[in-house]
Amino acid sequence: MEQKKIDVITLPQEYFDDLMVRMAHHSTAIEGNTLTYGQTELLLLFDKVDGNAKMQDLEEMKAHNVCLKMMQTEAADKERPLTETFVRKLHETLLREDYTVYKTLKDGTQTSYVVHAGVYKTRPNSVITATGERFEYASPEETPALMTSLVKWYNDAVEEGNMSILELASLFHYRYIRIHPFEDGNGRIARLLVNFILLRGGYPMIIVRSNDKDNYLNALNSSDINVGLIPSDGANAELEQIQPFT
């Protein structure tokens, strides 16, 4: 169901501070960041660090916050189309640098590979669904063309104006997740880009809460319909969050 637009620009700074902390905390927590909400708030609003926090988690949180601000700046320029260059730059900023992943295979063999920041995947990636089946995302060979097609589809849809913003965000989220263009960080980038679409369309940004992680991941893994519902559900929740500030 289409939501009423809210003039988010006129909302007070305290709302945006609250949103920034909630978004950074929940989006990174879904991916395993261990910072508490209080530690996140202390870091992002007061530039202070809790002595018990892990350095990797702190750096990851700060990088996500930079990405959030990049996304907001890009969304504000409604004359500028979405580009793959921006998507890759967002990913490069999020990951900060290339890093090596070490794994032990079932037979005990050690293997490793490099995750590249801001570069489309060079290795196949997949997920085990709730039913135990393996779902293969787009291959590395297919990914560049699919991302070009996705970005063009979004820009064309905005130009044509025949689709609601929530529908557009939902379908973009679905198509992006099916591609999984990067070797790491796909979930965080997907949520940032959904919010880019919503914000540019005059809607409040959404937050997938970390305590809804299982429902979120099940929706991603279960069906086309459920994947499409995620931005709509998030929009409903964020509209409720905005009410105290209006």
Which ranges hold each PLM region?
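FIC/Doc superfamily catalytic core
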Residues: 1-184, 188-246
